[in-house]
Regions:
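Periplasmic c-type cytochrome electron-transfer domains
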Residues: 2-5, 10-12, 23-379
Length: 379
């Protein structure tokens, strides 16, 4: 079934949307009262799959070049992009793990270096307003370039990486086929970005939005109604249910005092990019697609479970204390946002070509960063 683009889709009947979101008009505080009818199981007739903004179904993945995608697929999974041949893009963004390195609170890079921030999912990244929690990369290409030279992530230099790739005949041929030239940093980052553009994960929520009412259970639809009613969609909107704005961590109630510990540079968020005081502690709102697979949550990995994340967000961002039943229903809805094609993405992974570095001349040391065949790719 072909999914309709978001500007033509509707998520709830207009009458229900009006009832559930009236408290959001003019940026007023969300109504903390839940309509009595939402306390009961919701029959199919109450929530027909006629859905409306601010939520939307996932649009089709953009058109891509198959040769560039195949090359990017291999590069994404190749540890030769790191300084010591041990870390790949997939090390922190594993497709069989929600596109993250769950359950790590923050990523671990080259030499066991512990990074300062939680790894966001790579799935559906194409539709995000910017890349990274602080939005420092405008494009997927810029995002792909950064970790390679980050000393706590992949710890390499692009010049050395390209030299390494030029020593692999299969890569030389693949770059020639895809780009009509030899390996370069621009070609490599574009290929990785082209691959990432294919990592869309439509699921049951999209089938619901396209008209298949029974794609969501009664409890999941009750959770959706609550999610909308209490104001979650003021930030988690659009086809990704997030990824389109930057919001302060602790909009209504202070977050960092509750968390405790030192406030780090990573905690400054968007401020690190813009240096604007108004951006202090602001972060890109994360997508909620596949959120059930990406624990722990928040930029610092503070919330260990999805239930705890929902409770903390309601408290700090909306000024609301949820009942256990409300939390349960919202979590049920969030679990329905997992993609139905995740296994297909995993099966489509292409292992990088194995190659042995050229043997050094007698008496000369081996090339720094050279890798053995078994080290060429992540499992």
């Amino acid at each position: 079934m072909r999914l309709r683009p978001p500007n033509t889709s509707r998520l709830l009947t207009s009458a229900l949307v009006g009832a559930l979101t009236s408290g959001l008009a003019g940026c007023e505080p969300p109504d903390t009262r839940i309509p009595q009818q939402l306390e009961r199981p919701v029959p199919l007739s109450v929530l027909p799959a006629a859905v409306s903004p601010p939520l939307a179904v996932l649009p089709p993945a953009p058109e891509t070049n198959p040769d560039k995608v195949a090359l990017g697929n291999q590069l994404f999974h190749d540890t030769r992009l790191s300084g010591d041949g041990t870390v790949s893009c997939a090390s922190c963004h594993a497709l069989d793990n929600g596109g993250t390195d769950s359950p790590l609170k923050t990523s671990v890079g080259i030499g066991g270096a512990v990074g300062p921030i939680n790894a966001p999912t790579v799935f559906n990244a194409h539709w995000q307003i910017k890349q990274f929690w602080d939005g420092r990369a405008d494009t997927l290409e810029a995002q792909a370039a950064g970790p390679v030279e980050n000393p706590s992530e992949m710890g390499a230099k692009w010049e050395d990486v390209i030299t390494r790739l030029k020593g692999v005949p299969e890569y030389v041929a693949a770059f020639q086929k895809a780009y009509g030239g030899e390996p370069t940093k621009d070609h490599a980052t574009h290929a990785i970005a082209e691959y990432e553009r294919t990592l869309a994960t439509p699921g049951r929520f999209d089938r619901f939005g396209a008209g298949e009412v029974a794609a969501l259970s009664d409890e999941e639809r009750e959770g959706l109604a609550l999610f909308t009613k209490i104001g979650c969609t003021s930030c988690h909107a659009g086809p990704l249910l997030g990824g389109q704005s930057f919001e302060k961590m602790g909009t209504v109630r202070e977050y960092f005092k509750r968390r405790g510990g030192e406030v780090t540079d990573a905690d400054k968020g968007r401020f690190n990019v813009t240096k604007a005081p108004a951006d202090m502690h602001k972060f890109k709102v994360p997508t909620l697609r596949n959120v059930a697979l990406t624990a722990p949550y928040f930029h610092d990995g503070y919330a260990e479970t999805l239930e705890r994340a929902v409770e903390l967000m309601a408290h700090h961002q909306l000024g609301r204390t949820l009942t256990p039943d409300e939390t349960k229903k919202i979590v049920a809805f969030l679990k329905a946002l997992s993609g139905e094609n995740l296994d297909a993405h995993v099966k489509a992974i292409q292992k990088p070509p194995a190659a042995v570095a050229a043997a050094p001349a007698e008496g000369e040391p081996a090339e720094e960063g050279a890798v053995k065949p078994a080290e060429a790719a992540t499992p």
